[in-house]
Amino acid sequence: MNTSIRINCSKSYDDFVEASKFVGFCLYLIPGAILHVLILRILLIKQRKVFRNNSFFRIFATDSVVSLVLIFWGIFFNRLFMFIPPLCPLVSPLFFEPSLFLKMYYWMYNHARMSKSVAQILMVLNRMCCVISPIGYEKIWNKLAVTTVFVVLALPFFGSWNLLLSRMYIFPSYGGFNASYVKYVQWASLSMFQSIFLLIALCFTIICSSVSLYKLIILPDRIKSAEKSLCFVSLFYSIAFLVVAVSQLIFVFCEVCLKNRLYLLFQFFAFDFLTVGSAVIIMLSSPQLSNFLGFSGTFYRRKASPPGSTVVKIFTSVHNNSSII
């Protein structure tokens, strides 16, 4: 489909109000991006020797890169051209004809969304394996180091391949424009694949976190701090993926809801909660990482383990005597 698809930018939106929405998004997206960059700097550069053998942080580093992709496109494309009305008549003509740039943006953005789900599945599996087999799990996961990164980045191709074949176009949205696509393969709906990835990730989060918490509770010497932190982290991810799944299911099953202007804002906030929140939650839950980042306050204070107790590294400790989470 190589025909031109033109749009008329809406003039019914107040420039100041729309720009205020964009600024509002930036107020938390930019700090979130900075936090992800700082975490990656610690994990991959400054303290690489400390964290390189920790399988959980390897997966989280991949997830952080994916989050940065989402934040970058969120700030510099979809929110920018949607909520800054004066840009619409200037920029929109660039995308009336088929555009490789528009295709790569739309593909990367939605591919990254599904990568978040895959990374979450691997992280909760990693935590569960740690609790079930605290001695041997790290050796197994380190053998899968390259595989886990590959899976996070490659598995979403099963949901995004049709975008590479399809025609991208822009349509009026708020005071600017947004992007969508004309399906090349009719049955391969992006919303269907995204819903599948999200619901599977939500199920894995609930099941694996429940198993992990149960195994912690029945330990001979219960580790209260570990139980507390696991509950905290699991609750966050469960709520985050539930909210995102609800926003996606509304898109699939409630056509009337899509006409409501608030729906798109809700979907943005739902994904942003997961994208930005993942960096915040890992910082609050890992005393070691928090200290490397220069933050004195953490979610909990380290407590000495009782003599003879089993130290379980749920996901943030990198040495046998590290702080438990």
From Swiss-Prot:
Its main location: membrane. The lineage of its organism: Eukaryota, Metazoa, Ecdysozoa, Nematoda, Chromadorea. This is Serpentine receptor class gamma-16. Keywords: Membrane, Transmembrane, Transmembrane helix. One of its GO terms (biological process) is sensory perception of chemical stimulus. It is a multi-pass membrane protein. The chain crosses the membrane at residues 25-45, 65-85, 87-107, 144-164, 187-207, 232-252, 264-284. One of its GO terms (molecular function) is transmembrane signaling receptor activity. It comes from Caenorhabditis elegans. It holds the Pfam family Srg. Belongs to the nematode receptor-like protein srg family. It is found in: Membrane. One of its GO terms (cellular component) is membrane. The keyword Protein transport does not apply.
